[in-house]
């Protein structure tokens, strides 16, 4: 099953902060890079800069690390 922009996916990379969480595909890079799928999440991760709110709401994954839902 091919993943496309706008699809909802479950993260299968065990070392990821978002493991087994769901997100929406924001973009897919066709240039041949390893982690070509950018996924956007509803909540931020724990990587905030000292003294500021928030963290990352997107992360890049390889297609094999994602499960389309």
UniProtKB/Swiss-Prot annotation:
Cellular localization per UniProt: Cellular thylakoid membrane
Any single GO CC term annotated in Swiss-Prot or TrEMBL for this entry: photosystem I reaction center
SUPFAM superfamilies (UniProt xref): Electron transport accessory proteins
Pfam family, one: PSI_PsaE
Membrane topology: Peripheral membrane protein
GO BP terms, alphabetized: photosynthesis
Major location category of this protein: membrane
Family: Belongs to the PsaE family.
Protein name in UniProt: Photosystem I reaction center subunit IV
Encoding gene per record: psaE
């Amino acid at each position: 099953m091919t993943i496309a922009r706008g699809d909802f996916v479950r993260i299968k990379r065990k070392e990821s902060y978002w493991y087994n969480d769901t997100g929406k595909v924001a973009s897919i890079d066709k240039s041949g890079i390893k982690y070509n799928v950018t996924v956007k999440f509803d909540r931020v991760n724990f990587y905030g800069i000292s003294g500021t709110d928030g963290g990352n709401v997107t992360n890049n994954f390889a297609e094999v690390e994602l499960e389309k839902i």
